[in-house]
A protein has these predicted regions:
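Active-site SXXK
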Residues: 42-47
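N- or domain-start disorder-to-order transition segments that initiate the globular core
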Residues: 9-40
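Charge-rich, well-structured scaffold segments of protease-associated domains
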Residues: 1, 21-22, 26, 37, ...
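Aromatic (phenylalanine/tyrosine) cluster motif
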Residues: 3-4, 10
Length: 425
């Protein structure tokens, strides 16, 4: 049955089935090791290596060590030659388990974070999407930005950091992932040697319990008539990463697509909303997005437009949502499925994104979902499924809206809410 389902794209299926296998091993303390062998955040110092010595050790290997934080995950990653794997694992273990957290290092990173906060304020897209999370998930952890307020960065102490690490850096919550010329058995042996000391127990009743992140239909406006363009995002509550509705919503987002004023094509663009944007000069750019978290998500459209086109663009954006719920066609879905498959494959171009993908999959699903399985799930989506799932998440739902800039023309929230359904018989 599965073979029959994938028969129309048999050449693609053959290439996906031939993709490298991701192997997974769990240590006795709960730490998971995942690797995929192929043929081709800021870190402070550790107790063994001060920050300057750590940087020198990484540079002497010709490697790259960094870190990043998202709303649900923190990652430390290193890119290095295969022959330096033992040293790389040792350094990562030191960073995770033995950070020195000296006052000098903390003060240095404090200034780095404050500078990053200033840079984020200069990215109006980041500001708009942070405001969207703040209003959509108000009063919950997802409502906070990744960097947090500047007051926190200025007042954070060493004791705060130590308490956080002791509460959250536990083996069952960690994944050691690799991609490239790495033998899985060798990696497991190195992990046992370097990470076996990671605790899997919590002190007393200190087990962190995830907070329920409820969605609230609401709006937040930051009007500034001196700005040249308006930045606006509208979203409804989406599906969590493990929801069976995630793939139909990805297809739906692919139907809406994205647009930039620099695109060629004009009225010949594949996305209906993109064609309207080009023909009617509705906006400078827009993109459909779906931010998925463990138990919820945001399904939305972000656009940048002239202050005189806000009402028109908002109308057609919501109209595109209503079309997904009522009149999406076979050709729309077929085009979107092809675009989505190409996007998923293109995102794994290199060992760094592959490694990141492995780590997130193990944390979210407990396994790495192969591309062949994604392909099968996407191919199983039909127009009826898209209409049903979009009706479940979009139709007659309260949206969350964030807007920054010259937004006098942005409709009243009640008008935007009333455009989330059609009075048709």
């Amino acid at each position: 049955w599965t073979f029959y389902l994938l028969l129309p794209i048999f050449p693609l299926l053959l290439s996906l089935l031939g993709a490298p296998e991701t192997r997974l091993t769990t240590l006795s303390n709960g730490l998971r090791i995942a690797s995929e062998e192929t043929n081709q955040a800021t870190c402070t110092g550790t107790k063994k290596h001060p920050q300057s010595a750590l940087e020198q050790a990484v540079e002497s290997m010709g490697a790259h060590l960094s870190a990043y934080t998202s709303r649900e995950h923190t990652a430390y990653y290193m890119k290095t030659l295969a022959k330096d794997l033992p040293k790389a694992v040792e350094l990562l273990a030191e960073v995770v388990m033995s950070s020195s957290l000296s006052e000098a290092d903390i003060e240095q990173q404090r200034s780095v974070v404050l500078r990053e906060l200033e840079e984020v304020q200069g990215s109006l897209q980041d500001v708009c999407l942070d405001l969207l999370h703040a209003t959509a998930f108000q009063g919950t952890p997802l409502g906070h930005s990744v960097l947090g307020p500047s007051a926190n960065a200025r007042t954070l102490t060493r004791n705060d950091l130590v308490e956080y690490i002791n509460s959250h850096y536990k083996a069952p919550r960690m994944v050691l992932a690799t991609a490239g010329g790495v033998n899985h058995d060798d990696l497991v042996a190195l992990a046992k040697q370097q990470f076996s000391g990671v605790s899997f127990e919590y002190e007393g009743d200190a087990v962190p319990v995830p907070s329920l992140c409820r969605f609230t239909g609401s709006e937040i406006r930051m009007r500034d008539d001196e700005m040249p363009l308006a930045h606006i995002a509208i979203a409804v509550e989406g599906a969590g990463v493990a929801s069976p509705d995630i793939v139909p919503l990805m297809v739906a987002n692919s139907i809406i697509g994205s647009y930039d004023i620099t695109f060629g094509g004009g009225k010949h663009l594949s996305s209906r909303l993109a064609r309207l944007a080009a023909e009617l000069n509705l906006c400078h750019s827009f993109q459909a997005f779906h931010s998925s978290y463990s138990d919820t998500g945001l399904l939305g459209i972000y656009f940048v437009t002239d202050k005189h086109k806000i009402e028109d663009m908002m109308h057609w954006a919501q109209n595109a949502w209503m079309n997904l719920c009522t009149t999406v066609t076979e050709s729309d879905v077929a085009r979107a499925k092809n675009a989505l498959k190409a996007s998923l494959v293109g995102q794994l171009n290199g060992t760094t994104p592959v490694c990141d993908d492995i780590g997130r999959h193990i944390l979210n699903y407990g396994r790495r979902i192969p591309l062949a399985e994604w392909d099968a799930r996407i191919e199983a989506v039909t127009p009826r499924i898209v209409r049903d799932v979009c009706s479940k998440y979009i139709y007659d739902k309260c949206p969350a809206v964030s807007a920054v800039g010259p937004i006098e023309q942005l409709p009243d929230y009640n008008r935007m809410r009333s455009a989330m359904y059609w009075l048709r018989f």
